[in-house]
Regions:
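N-terminal export/targeting leaders of redox proteins
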Residues: 1-25, 104
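Short amphipathic alpha-helical segments at helix boundaries and their inter-helical linkers
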Residues: 4, 27, 84-87
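Short, solvent-exposed coil/turn segments
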Residues: 10, 17, 51-53, 75
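Extracytoplasmic/secreted proteins, especially bacterial periplasmic and envelope-associated proteins
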Residues: 26, 30, 66, 70, ...
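Periplasmic/extracellular electron-transfer cofactor-ligation site
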Residues: 28-55, 77-83, 102-104
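Electron-transfer interface patches adjacent to heme c in soluble/periplasmic c-type cytochromes
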Residues: 56-69, 84-91
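Short leucine-rich amphipathic alpha-helices used at interfaces
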Residues: 69-71, 76-77
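C-terminal capping alpha-helices of c-type cytochrome domains
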Residues: 74-75, 86-104
């Protein structure tokens, strides 16, 4: 019985990890398609874009402090010069917000 329970726990963990990895990949693809043109492929905007639009890099303490929920709200509603990103499902918004938090 213990061996069977252990096997079920390992299987559940593997399925959860695979789901999280797919979610991160979806977030990366959405970021590349919808965000990277302004925020840069690694979260560091070009000098011109940073100056023109006031975009801070992900390494900025104020950006690092953002929660996933705050990033989701910005993606959905926009903030400052950033317009809302239209056409994304709630799952895509969450995925891109979680991906954004992984950028250094």
């Amino acid at each position: 019985m213990t061996k069977m329970l252990r096997s079920q726990i390992v299987l559940a963990a593997a399925v959860s990890l695979a789901g999280a990895m797919c979610f991160a990949q979806d977030g990366a693809a959405t970021y590349k398609a919808k965000c990277a043109m302004c925020h840069g492929p690694t979260g560091t905007p070009s000098a011109g874009m940073a100056k023109a639009m006031g975009i801070k890099p992900v390494s900025d303490p104020s950006i690092k402090a953002l929660t996933v929920a705050q990033i989701e709200a910005t993606v959905k509603s926009g903030k400052g010069k950033m317009k809302p990103i239209a056409g994304l499902t709630d799952a895509q918004v969450t995925a891109v917000a979680e991906y954004f938090k992984t950028l250094k």
